[in-house]
Regions:
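DNA polymerase processivity clamps
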Residues: 1-33, 48-169
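Glycine-rich, pocket-lining loop/helix-strand segments that form or immediately flank
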Residues: 36
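Short hinge/gating elements
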Residues: 43-46
Length: 169
């Protein structure tokens, strides 16, 4: 959409529950949300005890490999963070196990922490951002995780963790 010529006409069509934007061969259709939009700011953690900076390419490569195994187990991948590394673990009965460590920088927090995510949701954002590092921040294994990038201050992606039996305190 960044390459759209701002001088061209855009045809806008609105129905009861959809809006469409058409220009040349480009067509964008979106659903119109009825009622009051939820307060998304309530989900974004303001303070986080654990913050990590990870090289995006290394994290992406390991996460994609974990996703190959995780597809057989509801896409659940577990992450164990310590002072210098994140261990990425995926298991699937009959398919095998995956474990890989990726170097990171711990920005804040002192304890080793574990959290699990749907790897597809995490990959969606890591593949999309064009940055050298991604920042992950969360309080504990059940709190929302805030993913940010240094280059764009207003970019915030929230991913909710998955509760797993082996990652409960």
């Amino acid at each position: 959409m960044q390459n759209i010529d701002s001088e061209k006409e855009v045809e806008i069509t609105i129905s009861e529950n959809q809006i469409a934007f058409k220009m040349d061969e480009f067509l964008l259709i979106s659903r119109i949300i009825q009622g009051q939009f939820p307060n998304y700011k309530q989900v974004i953690p303001e303070e986080t005890g654990n913050r990590f900076k990870i090289k995006r390419e290394d994290f992406l490569a390991a996460a994609e490999r974990a996703a190959l195994i995780a597809t057989a187990s509801n896409n659940v991948v577990r992450f164990s963070f310590d002072k210098e590394n994140v261990s990425i673990v995926a298991n699937a009965k009959g398919l095998g196990d995956f474990k890989e460590e990726v170097n990171l920088e711990r920005v804040s927090g002192e304890d080793d922490v574990k959290i699990a995510f749907n790897i597809r949701l995490l990959l969606d954002v890591i593949k999309t951002v064009n940055t050298e590092y991604v920042n992950l921040a969360f309080n504990n294994e059940l709190s929302p995780c805030k993913l940010t990038i240094d280059e764009q201050e207003d970019f915030i992606y929230i991913i909710m963790p998955i509760r797993t039996a082996d990652y409960q305190n």
